[in-house]
Amino acid sequence: MDDQLLHSFLPNARIAIVGSGAVGLFHGIKLAIGGLDVRFLLRSDLETARKQGIRLLSAEGDLLYAGSSFYGSSSEIAEVDLVVISIKATANQVLGELLPPLLGKETWLLTLQNGLGNEEVLSATFNTDRVLGGVCYVAASRFQQAVVRHFGGGTIALGDTARPARRVVQEIAAAFERCRILCQQSEDLNSARWGKLLWNICFNGLGIAAGSLPGLLQQ
C-alpha cells in the first residue's frame, strides 16, 4: 500500500483481534465502540459474547459492545486489513494455523504481546515486512467469560520494524487515540520492549508474592 493512500486505510479497515484475553478484549472493545470494524476471534467466550456482548468494567467508565462481530474461526472472519495479535507469546506456534485465513497482500500485523522477538517471529513465519509492535502498559484482568476488569493504565508504545518508521504507524496511533486508547509512537521499538521487560522484572514477582494485586495484573 502506497503511503499516500494510508489516509483512507484505517477509517474503513477491517481489524481482527487474535487473542481475546484481557489485553485483546480491552483494546478491541474500545476500537469497536469507537466505530471501527473489529472482528473478535473467540474460543471459550464465543457463546457468551454472542448472547450478551463483551463488557469492560473500568473506573474510567464501563463499556458494553454487543455487536455481531464474534467468530469461532479465522476462516469465518476472512481477510482483514489489520491483525492485532494479543495471545500469549508462549503460544506463538498456533499463529501458523490461526493467521493465514486473515492475511491478504496488504494486511498489516500488530503484535501487542509481551516479550522479545515477537516481531521477528511474525516476519519470518509469514514472510512479510508489514509487521508493527506495540508495548502495552495496562492493568486489566479477564475475570469471567467476555468480561474484563480494568484497574488502571492503558498506554501503548507503538513502533515499526522498519527504519524510518512508515506512515501507517501514525495512522494507527491516531485511530487508537480517537477510540480513547492512549498511543505514543516509539522511535526505538526494541528499547521500548527492553524497558517493559525491566519494569516487569521489578514488579511481577512482587505481584505474585502479594497474591496478584489488581494493580499489577497484565502490566
What role is predicted for each listed range?
Residues 13-14, 81, 154:
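Nucleotide donor/acceptor-binding cores
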Residues 101-102, 125-130, 143-219:
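Internal alpha-helical scaffold of NAD(P)-dependent oxidoreductase catalytic cores
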Residues 46-51, 119-120, 166:
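Short, charged/polar "capping" segments at the starts of alpha-helices
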Residues 42, 60, 74, 113, ...:
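Residues at the C-termini of beta-strands that transition into short coil/loop
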Residues 2-62:
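NAD(P)+-binding Rossmann beta1-loop-alpha1 motif at the extreme N-terminus of oxidoreductases
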Residues 15, 37-39, 128-131, 183:
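Hydrophobic anchor at the start of a short beta-strand
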Residues 17, 39-42, 85-86, 111-112, ...:
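Active-site-adjacent beta-strand anchor residues
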Residues 63-147:
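Rossmann-like NAD(P)(H) cofactor-binding subdomain of soluble oxidoreductases
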